[in-house]
A protein has these predicted regions:
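Catalytic NTP-binding/metal-coordinating core of nucleotidyl cyclase/transferase enzymes
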Residues: 1-63
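Short, conserved phosphate/pyrophosphate- and ester-handling motifs at nucleotide-, phospho-/glycolipid
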Residues: 5, 144, 173
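Generic signal for short, ordered secondary-structure residues
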Residues: 11, 15, 40, 88-89, ...
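Residue-level detector of alpha-helical recognition elements and their boundaries
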Residues: 24, 36, 47, 66, ...
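Juxtamembrane helix-loop transition sites at the ends of transmembrane segments
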Residues: 26-29, 38, 110, 138, ...
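Short glycine-enriched loop/turn motifs at secondary-structure junctions
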Residues: 45-48, 110-113, 168-170
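Catalytic beta-strand-to-alpha-helix segment of the class III nucleotidyl cyclase homology domain
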Residues: 52-161
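Intrinsically disordered or compositionally simple regulatory linkers and C-terminal tails
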Residues: 153-177
Length: 177
């Protein structure tokens, strides 16, 4: 699970007005949709100036996060994003929402992340894409959790090929004439 938040959006809205905030958000959401499509990650829901995403493969989630971070530099300038990633089981609740420990952890990690930061628990790293580096981070004490969580910050650029959720299907015969 991935949670993304635009840092400073409330202050930006207060200083620049609703119209400017709406334009920035529309720009960022368009970029987010593109990156999700290119990496095979699904946007589960929009959360105002953020979103929750679901990925089957952790490498796809990491590719998504780092690519979105890069593209958000211009899409939501002068603001930045912060990201939390967590893996685990969850319940699909009433057909359109996910609940569970992994979901809560990803949301709390996003809240704790600094601008331009992508964080993940150390014990949940499964298989990072080539080119991605895990940098030690101080343990985090998160709201609702009894113990500090050991996390790392992910940085770098995935050099292995990202999956495209539609290109693989629609560019092959019999769909191409």
């Amino acid at each position: 699970f991935v949670f993304v938040d635009i840092s400073g959006f409330t202050n930006f809205t207060n200083e620049n007005g609703d119209d400017a905030a709406g334009r920035l958000l529309a720009s960022w959401r368009a970029v987010t949709r593109d990156v999700a499509s290119e990496t095979g990650v699904r946007i589960a829901k929009w959360l105002g100036d953020g979103c929750m995403l679901v990925a089957v493969d952790q490498r796809d989630a990491v590719r998504f996060c780092l690519e979105l971070q890069k593209r958000s530099a211009s899409a939501c300038a002068p603001l930045s994003i912060r990201v939390g990633i967590a893996s685990g089981l969850a319940l699909l609740f009433e057909g359109d929402d996910y609940i569970g420990t992994a979901v809560n952890l990803a949301a709390r990690l996003c809240d704790a992340a600094a601008s331009y930061e992508v964080i993940i628990p150390v014990d949940q790293i499964e298989n990072l894409p080539e080119g991605v580096i895990a940098i030690p981070h101080e343990p985090l004490t998160l709201r609702g959790l009894n113990e500090a969580i050991n996390v790392v910050t992910l940085t770098g650029e995935a050099t292995d090929v990202a999956r495209n959720d539609t290109g693989e299907l629609w560019t092959r015969s019999p769909f191409v004439m």
